[in-house]
């Protein structure tokens, strides 16, 4: 019998979330971002659930090949662009569009003499990660347009702080829009998830929706439910053992948690090797038998322990939700100093 743990993906939730983001996009073309194996939800599931998206955006040609094999016939965009001259031929074979963010990529395209490559010029409007400075971007676009077989589609940028709670960040959406200048009024794909949800002033003819498609709010101060989003992944497991622990006894590595009363401790078949963070502190909620039980002790590689003293129904075989509909992944992420997307 397999170990009792699974990540269940709700395709209807994915479809619902796409509909929410589609309505927020207000008629603009929508790229569904499926990088990192569709944020851990599976590229095959993404192809099925995001059939109504205008295109899929990912990181490399391996992903593009997978989604083509899964039956995706619409547009595909490489968000980080191509990495080597050898990528140009499969770009064309797979009919994949690519971001261009650096002069070396222009040189590769010029030397490759492509027959049909569609490019999106990345603009560094203040995030300082990828892209040409706003003053350099039109020059890059002109150089690309001069290469036979290359078609420039639009300008693309990415906001560093598009969350609703980031209005006082060192670099704001307004700062980056100002840096874009007239480029923001040309053919452009500007809005990421946060900008789609919280910044209607960001225009452009296309948007890129990421984590919200999977039911995760981009702002930990705003719940997914408040945005109309439904968590699409449920990480579930089962209780595999129970321990009666006396006051003064401790649980787990490092003896981090000590019982203050006679306690009933449940051992759950999930650990950090399964993606549940080892850094999760005591007290983090786990859903079992219709109630929340607190984490009690350090997370092990393939087990964790929870205090079910106040949940008498909890027993060996009881189903446990680590995150999903009842336990918000953003809440867990905040407790261990990361973001929901990482989990």
Q: Predicted regions: what is each one?
A:
Residues 2-3, 36-51, 89-94, 104-118, ...:
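Active-site loop/helix belt of alpha/beta enzymes
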Residues 36, 59-61, 81, 101-103, ...:
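Fold-independent oxyanion-binding glycine-rich loops
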Residues 244-343:
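C-terminal accessory subdomain/extension
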């Amino acid at each position: 019998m397999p170990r009792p743990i699974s990540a269940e993906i709700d395709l209807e939730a994915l479809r619902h979330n796409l509909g929410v983001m589609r309505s927020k996009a207000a008629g603009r073309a929508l790229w569904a971002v499926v990088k990192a194996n569709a944020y851990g939800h599976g590229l095959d599931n993404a192809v099925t659930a995001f059939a109504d998206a205008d295109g899929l955006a990912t990181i490399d040609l391996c992903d593009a090949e997978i989604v083509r094999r899964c039956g995706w016939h619409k547009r595909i965009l490489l968000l980080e662009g191509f990495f080597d001259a050898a990528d140009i031929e499969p770009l064309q074979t797979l009919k994949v569009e690519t971001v261009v963010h650096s002069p070396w990529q222009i040189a590769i395209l010029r030397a490759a003499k492509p027959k049909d490559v569609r490019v999106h010029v990345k603009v560094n409007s203040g995030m300082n990660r990828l892209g040409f400075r706003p003053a350099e971007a039109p020059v890059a676009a002109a150089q690309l347009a001069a290469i036979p077989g290359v078609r420039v589609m639009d300008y693309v940028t990415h906001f560093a702080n598009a969350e609703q709670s980031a209005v006082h960040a060192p670099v704001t959406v307004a700062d980056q829009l100002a840096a874009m200048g007239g480029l923001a009024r040309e053919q452009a794909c500007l809005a990421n998830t946060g900008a789609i949800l919280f910044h209607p002033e960001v225009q452009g003819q296309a948007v890129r929706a990421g984590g919200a498609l999977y039911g995760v709010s981009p702002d930990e101060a705003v719940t997914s439910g408040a945005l109309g989003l439904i968590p699409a992944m449920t990480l579930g497991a089962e209780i595999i053992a129970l321990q009666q622990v006396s006051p003064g006894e401790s649980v787990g590595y490092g003896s981090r948690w000590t019982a203050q009363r006679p306690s009933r401790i449940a051992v759950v078949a999930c650990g950090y090797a399964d993606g549940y963070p080892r850094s999760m502190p005591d007290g983090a909620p786990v859903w079992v038998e219709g109630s929340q039980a607190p984490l009690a002790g350090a997370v092990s590689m393939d087990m964790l322990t929870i205090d079910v003293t106040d949940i008498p129904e909890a027993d060996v075989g009881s189903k446990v939700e680590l995150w999903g509909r009842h336990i918000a992944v953003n809440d867990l992420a905040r407790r261990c100093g990361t973001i929901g997307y990482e989990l």
